[in-house]
Amino acid sequence: MKKNTLGLPLEYEKLSEYFDARNIGDDTDAKNSVIERLLKTYKVQTVLDLTCGTGSQVFFLTKRGYKCVGADFSPALLEIARKRAHEEKVAIKFIDGDMRTLRVGRFDAVISIFNAVGHLTKVGFEKTMKNVHQNLKAGGIYIFDILNLEAMTDAVVADLAYCTHKKFNGTQMHLVQFSTINRNNGRLTSYDNYIVQKNAAKPEKFGNKFSLQIYTAKELVTTQKIEVTTLGQAISGYLNGNVW
């Protein structure tokens, strides 16, 4: 997996087996339903997920009749997705690739969810937007979500601090996280400290730092010609292939 300028969560590689435990929550079904509603509106049949991770969106959409391809630049997460597809006997093609450069074909829709584009620098985001266009049919749409810089008040950033303890499959994971924001460059930085114990083994400690590049809705509309909807702390947006 390529190095990332802004850093990445440990679950993308070293702790990939805990990705779903940390990232898949009560809001996942709600996000998937919003995506499906947009796909129906634009009569989408084929979908490319450029940042599929372990496959949350592509499994959901495939089971609803969409023809999906999943891609990610984390081999560890793709291994989990491929294993699940085999176990559930679901026909989904998974591809190793970087959303900034990967060319797969032409699709009715391209998606990247869970703040995936926030892991890119502004230059990387620009490259991704151009590459998305190369993977879309004429009139196709790009759906993504990202944090809304205007909504990230000091109180909201402070509220991102949390401590959680999860137990699953004989493993216990304790995570403490807090975040800071630089409003001058629009970067939200998270600091993670993990304690992981597998069965009765000696607990392991992991520390990590990564940043998200976030934007105001105005920035996205002005620089990328993206239609956006602000949803409190988040921005959901889509690019129509006809207006690039």
Briefly describe each language-model feature range.
Residues 1-45:
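Conserved class I S-adenosyl-L-methionine
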Residues 139-146:
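Conserved beta-strand signature within the Rossmann-like core of class I S-adenosyl-L-methionine
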Residues 55-101:
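Class I SAM-dependent methyltransferase SAM/SAH-binding core
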Residues 126-138:
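A short glycine-rich, Lys/Arg-flanked "PGG" loop and its adjoining helix->strand segment in the class I
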Residues 146-221:
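SAM-dependent methyltransferase
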Residues 100-109:
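A short acidic, Gly/Pro-enriched loop at the edge of an enzyme's catalytic core
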Residues 108-124:
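A short SAM/SAH-binding and catalytic strip from SAM-dependent methyltransferases
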Residues 51:
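Conserved S-adenosyl-L-methionine
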